[in-house]
Amino acid sequence: LLPLSTAHAGVSVQYDSTRSFIPNSAKGGTILIDKHRSRMDVGTNASVIFDGNAQSMEIISHDDKTYTVLDKASAEAISAELEPALQQMRTQLQALPPEQREMMEKMMAERMGINLQGAAEQEPDLDLKKTDKSGESGGIACNWWQATDDTVLRYEYCVTPAKSVPYGDDLLKYFHDLKQFKREIVGTINRSGALQIPSLPIADVREIEGLPPISRQYQDGKLILETRFVSVTETDLPAATFNLPEGYSEQKLPGVAR
């Protein structure tokens, strides 16, 4: 009898990420991809397992030995559970003087990520424009695109054709699925005003017609985050790569019953 295989081939993306407003914030990480599934390890403390077909994300804390599931059902449950309480808080704030009300709204937004001013608008469609500048990361040459909102720079992507990147088709699928998750699942939560999940520099690979070995995010005209591919290689993926660790317990989001 042939031995059962405990691993199969997948794609490994090594990347570096730097937050410009935090000194010495450069961090390396790994994304493992197998068709519609992916796993990103963030240092040794956390992992994120994503299923593009199911549009489901499992956020794992190795320190606490817990995980949280974020999908369409949980996003809708969060909005439904928190909205009545938020509406009551908004009503109470209306009785405050304007300056005090503004101060409270700002404090809740900054400290708790709660939008008391009402439901957030869906992230606007951005204007994408190819520039004449070029770049390189991990030995991959690319050309810069800019994404602006009413002339305000939001993102920059250094783009290369998928065929120029090893396993480019797998990466195209990954980026497309992740962009859909951001738009539909994260968008559901943000539009409710219940919680505000920070925007992520995820390119729409269909619009830029390629892959971004370098992604940059801007806020108020200043660079706040840059992510670069260091390498893209084939790797053996153990059968348990996309499984939740044994012994970890689920930490449910507000309003979510499983």
Over which residues does each language-model region extend?
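C-terminal segment of classical bacterial N-terminal signal peptides
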Residues: 1-8
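Extended soluble regions of mature proteins
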Residues: 9-258
